[in-house]
Amino acid sequence: MRHEEVFGLMKTLVDAHTMGIDTAVSLLRECNYKVIVSPLRVQKALETLESEESQRIILDWIKSNKINHIGVSYRLDPRDAVNIFGRLVALLKKEQYFESLSANVKSIYFAGLKPACDEIEREYSGRICTFRGGESPEETLMVMGI
């Protein structure tokens, strides 16, 4: 992975859990990567992805910040986590931001509760790396390909 690549880390507005995102930001910055944390407007948009306006907010955030790797954290209800994450991935694929020849987003990570991580790993056949909490700094960086 090249140091010019940009990591965008997201969570929903209702999820107050920030320790994992804060740790990832510190680790990535220590390795000289640029990290963008989603502002409140993007966090709110992630909660309402069925809205075209919310979709545009997220796509604009990714494009304007030239984000190559996206991390999503959701440590509340596992079913909600899978639904929100699924809508995000579907949007990124539909708009050719992910898993297409012209895609700028090379990888997506998910951090959440074990049941949500299990379902996401099953649904995406290992294409999405997950974090369940408690990973060492070395494990975190290794999962992120660093």
Give each language-model segment a name.
Residues 124-127, 146:
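Conserved catalytic or regulatory cores that recognize and/or transform ribose-phosphate-containing ligands
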Residues 127-137:
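Short acidic-hydrophobic, aromatic-tinged amphipathic segments that line or gate anion-handling sites
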Residues 36-124:
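Cofactor-cradling patches in redox/metallo enzymes
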Residues 5-8, 108:
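Conserved hydrophobic helix-helix packing surfaces used for dimerization/oligomerization
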Residues 23-37:
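Short helix-loop-beta junction
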Residues 14-21:
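Glycine- and acidic-residue-enriched helix-capping/strand-helix junction motifs
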Residues 135-146:
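C-terminal helix of von Willebrand factor
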